[in-house]
């Protein structure tokens, strides 16, 4: 393919608002074009990469026994109202009305729609298990789109769904998808971790996340040098709290003017922050019409893990209380909240590290005052103890090794949904005994366009993108140094023909640009192999450069095809080490 015929608008500088390396380089290399905040056009090079990713996905899905289909992106809201996600999904859900004032959404995911098709199409367990998937654009009204195509309002996604008559069928489908996902990411050339994760708004109790370590990752991976890895929302560590043995002292209220944080209160009271209780008021949505105020107590040096609180309460949503909520339930302002004297209408949860404390300090539910020497049971109640904290780096993980943290990009997620959706939407089949039973579901997703950012983050350098050979837009970039010289262009065309006939995809830079511009653009674009046709063309010699390493070698034209094959094979083997 001739480069002069392809839209590749390279730039010398990235936009000033581009933060991530992948964002900067994909714009500079002419892969993407911003239409609006969070909305992108994928230009020819990017689209070629996407198609290669899709082909790998389709191949592995076929091997896993999944069948491709396609759902609409515009969905009637009725099913989402029936499942409860029309409200619980929050502000990220695009909502709209048609001309007849009927509610619709732009699909951020398709559990409900696939479940409806299954419900209306399959009535017997004999038709199960079934695994289906689609490759389709999704829509989420992100509050803060950022990092280019890493977090946008429209993006392509693989979403797959399994339907089984029993738990064994779900387990088999889940394991097959997990294997397929590993194969996909291995073939693409990503460094990734499979981690324990929280299911969030998806429902279900068991899930695993595939996360690509990267500096711009918005998730925190807690992992060890052993087998343990988890999203920070799910991560656990060995409990090391020691029961304090001090004699409970009389509770006292002390003035703490201007102290609104744990550390300010600790300084005012001359206490260690881990002896001060952090009291966080939340409003939990338990059902469509039921809301529960919840006070979560943490040791002062710990942070609340809201995902763990949601799971403990089994609630649909959890929101930090407003100032009005605090006044309504505790007659106080945030910054001076505490558990002493709190009424029964407020549920009190306390982290396990609070349980071992004696003579602790806490807010007095009065501005400018704190209690000291407050003790559980004597001075305030706790309705439920549990692990409600974020783990810390260096703590001991369940596998006995110290935890390490690294940021990661979520590139895939698999869920055991169980009957979360089928029970709500009436997806049932007759079992072997002729009884109606809810279908057992799994859900599986990969962010297709997000993968491009993840690969770029892990592989780009200061000169541009560096694509793995499996998804590069072309295999070889042929550059005649001087397109005005007939011998160089003739050799470039001959090389193009030879490589194409050998099964390689070739981009020939036939532009009448300076050599420096061509080489800079080639580095930006990131094609694995560059073949330079220069002054030695008259002797039948060309230079090969490996984009990833910068290594160069001169070869005769008749040896070129064989050498390119060897180099690409080596790159592929190194990628999979």
From Swiss-Prot:
Matching InterPro entries: aa-tRNA-synt_IIb, aa-tRNA-synth_II, aa-tRNA-synth_II/BPL/LPL, Anticodon-bd, Anticodon-bd_dom_sf, Pro-tRNA-ligase_IIa, Pro-tRNA-synth_IIa_bac-type, Pro-tRNA-Synthase_IIa_type1
What PROSITE patterns does its record include? AA_TRNA_LIGASE_II
GO MF, one annotated term:
transferase activity
Q: Which UniProt keywords apply?
A: Aminoacyl-tRNA synthetase, ATP-binding, Cytoplasm, Ligase, Nucleotide-binding, Protein biosynthesis
Reactions listed under catalytic activity: tRNA(Pro) + L-proline + ATP = L-prolyl-tRNA(Pro) + AMP + diphosphate
Q: What is its main location?
A: cytoplasm
Biological function: Catalyzes the attachment of proline to tRNA(Pro) in a two-step reaction: proline is first activated by ATP to form Pro-AMP and then transferred to the acceptor end of tRNA(Pro). As ProRS can inadvertently accommodate and process non-cognate amino acids such as alanine and cysteine, to avoid such errors it has two additional distinct editing activities against alanine. One activity is designated as 'pretransfer' editing and involves the tRNA(Pro)-independent hydrolysis of activated Ala-AMP.
The protein in question is named Proline--tRNA ligase
Species the sequence originates in: Limosilactobacillus reuteri (strain DSM 20016)
């Amino acid at each position: 393919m001739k480069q002069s015929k392809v839209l590749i608008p390279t730039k010398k500088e990235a936009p000033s608002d581009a933060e991530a390396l992948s964002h900067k380089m994909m714009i500079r290399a002419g892969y993407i074009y911003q239409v609006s905040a969070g909305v992108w056009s994928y230009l020819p090079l990017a689209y070629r990469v996407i198609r290669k990713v899709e082909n790998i996905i389709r191949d592995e899905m076929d091997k896993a026994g999944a069948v491709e289909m396609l759902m609409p992106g515009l969905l009637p809201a009725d099913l989402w109202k029936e499942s409860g996600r029309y409200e619980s999904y929050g502000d990220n859900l695009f909502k709209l009305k048609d001309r007849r004032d009927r509610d619709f959404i732009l699909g951020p995911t398709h559990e409900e729609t696939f479940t409806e098709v299954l419900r209306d199409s399959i009535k017997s367990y004999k038709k199960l298990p079934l695994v289906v998937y689609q490759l389709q654009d999704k829509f989420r009204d992100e509050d803060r789109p950022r990092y280019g195509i890493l977090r946008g309002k429209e993006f392509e996604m693989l979403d797959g769904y399994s339907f089984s008559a029993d738990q064994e069928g779900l387990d088999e489908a889940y394991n097959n998808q997990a294997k397929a996902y590993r194969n996909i990411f291995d073939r693409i050339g990503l460094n990734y971790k499979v981690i324990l994760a929280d299911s969030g708004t998806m429902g279900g109790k068991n899930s695993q996340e595939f996360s690509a370590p990267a500096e711009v990752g918005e998730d925190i991976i807690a992992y060890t040098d052993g087998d343990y890895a988890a999203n920070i929302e799910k991560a656990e560590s060995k409990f090391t709290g020691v029961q304090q043995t001090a004699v409970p002292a009389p509770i006292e209220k002390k003035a703490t003017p201007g102290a609104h944080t744990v550390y300010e209160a600790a300084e005012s009271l001359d206490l260690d922050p881990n002896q001060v209780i952090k009291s966080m008021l939340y409003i939990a949505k338990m059902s469509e019409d039921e809301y529960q105020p919840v006070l979560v107590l943490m040791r002062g040096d710990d942070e609340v893990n809201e995902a763990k609180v949601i799971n403990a309460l089994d609630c649909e949503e959890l929101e930090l209380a407003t100032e009005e909520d605090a006044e309504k339930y505790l007659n106080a302002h945030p910054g001076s909240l505490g558990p002493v004297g709190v009424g029964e209408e407020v549920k009190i949860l306390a982290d396990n590290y609070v349980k071992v404390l004696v003579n602790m300090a806490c807010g007095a539910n009065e501005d400018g005052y704190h209690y000291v020497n407050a003790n559980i049971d004597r001075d305030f109640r706790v309705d439920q103890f549990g692990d409600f904290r974020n783990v810390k780096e260096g703590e001991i993980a369940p596998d006995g090794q110290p935890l390490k943290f690294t940021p990661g990009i979520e590139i895939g997620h698999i869920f055991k949904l169980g009957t979360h959706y089928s029970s709500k939407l009436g997806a049932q089949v007759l079992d072997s005994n002729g009884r109606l039973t809810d279908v057992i579901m799994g859900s599986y997703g990969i962010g297709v366009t997000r993968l491009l950012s993840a690969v770029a983050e892990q592989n780009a350098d200061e000169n541009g993108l560096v694509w793995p050979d499996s998804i590069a837009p072309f295999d070889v970039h042929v550059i005649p140094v001087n397109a005005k010289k007939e011998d160089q262009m003739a050799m470039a065309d001959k090389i193009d023909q030879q490589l194409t006939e050998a099964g390689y995809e070739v981009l020939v830079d036939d532009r009448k640009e300076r050599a420096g511009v061509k080489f800079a653009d080639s580095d930006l674009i990131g094609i694995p192999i560059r073949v330079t046709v220069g002054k030695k063309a008259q002797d039948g010699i060309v230079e090969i450069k490996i984009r990833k390493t910068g290594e160069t070698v001169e070869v005769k034209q008749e040896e070129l095809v064989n050498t390119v094959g060897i180099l690409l094979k080596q790159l592929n083997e190194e990628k999979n080490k």
